[in-house]
Amino acid sequence: MNDIKPAIMMVLVFTIICGGIYPAVVTGIAQAVFPKEATGSFITDRSGREIGSALIGQPFSDSKYFWPRPSATTDFGYNPAASGGSNSGPTNPDYLKTVANRVKALKDTGVSTGIPTDLVQASASGLDPHISPEAASVQIPRVAKARGMMEDKVRRLVSGHTEDRQFGIIGSPRVNVLALNLALDRLAP
């Protein structure tokens, strides 16, 4: 019993430190320094109701909205509990069929120019909330027509919602689909 007592004490001490104190300190610092990000970067509508997160993609299929990247999550699209890519390789027949179907669906909506890959391939997480400015641009005619808006007005809105690379060097320019669609709803519901 004397041999096991120090081991049990160490388990209890490290459980308290690693399972209680450390998470509480990190959460407290995050809440103080990055309050919005620490609570999930939620986006609210005009009434203040939380309708989504700037960090997790949401499905949009109506022609009056910009469409996000396809989701690769299981059970249902954009399932945050099942985040992950499809893990299908570029020569996998099922993957190729899925991409071909997505390309066809986009062409059926009138996209005749080059289709950006982020509109037909899921991200590694399967939950990416952003698309490239190019992916937004090819959707402008459809969205403008569905809302009865001038394409130039929609193009300016996309340009205004295009975020630069992080710190000027990391990643690519991107457009948050949820934020863009909310701005569209404010202009022309």
UniProtKB/Swiss-Prot annotation:
A single GO molecular-function term is:
ATP binding
Pfam families per UniProt: KdpC
Keyword Transmembrane helix carried by entry: yes
**Record's keyword terms, sorted:** ATP-binding, Cell inner membrane, Cell membrane, Ion transport, Membrane, Nucleotide-binding, Potassium, Potassium transport, Transmembrane, Transmembrane helix, Transport
Record's bilayer topology term: Single-pass membrane protein
Location in the cell reads:
Cell inner membrane
**Which InterPro entries does this UniProt record tie to the protein?**
KdpC
Q: Tell whether Disulfide bond is among the UniProt keywords.
A: no
TM ranges are 6-26
A GO-annotated cellular component:
plasma membrane
Chief localization class?
membrane
The secretion signal range is none
Cysteines joined through disulfide linkages? none
What protein family is recorded?
Belongs to the KdpC family.
Q: What does this protein do?
A: Part of the high-affinity ATP-driven potassium transport (or Kdp) system, which catalyzes the hydrolysis of ATP coupled with the electrogenic transport of potassium into the cytoplasm. This subunit acts as a catalytic chaperone that increases the ATP-binding affinity of the ATP-hydrolyzing subunit KdpB by the formation of a transient KdpB/KdpC/ATP ternary complex.
Q: How does it assemble?
A: The system is composed of three essential subunits: KdpA, KdpB and KdpC.
UniProt name for this protein: Potassium-transporting ATPase KdpC subunit
The organism of origin for this protein:
Geobacter metallireducens (strain ATCC 53774 / DSM 7210 / GS-15)
Per the UniProt record, the lineage of the source organism begins with: Bacteria, Pseudomonadati, Thermodesulfobacteriota, Desulfuromonadia, Geobacterales
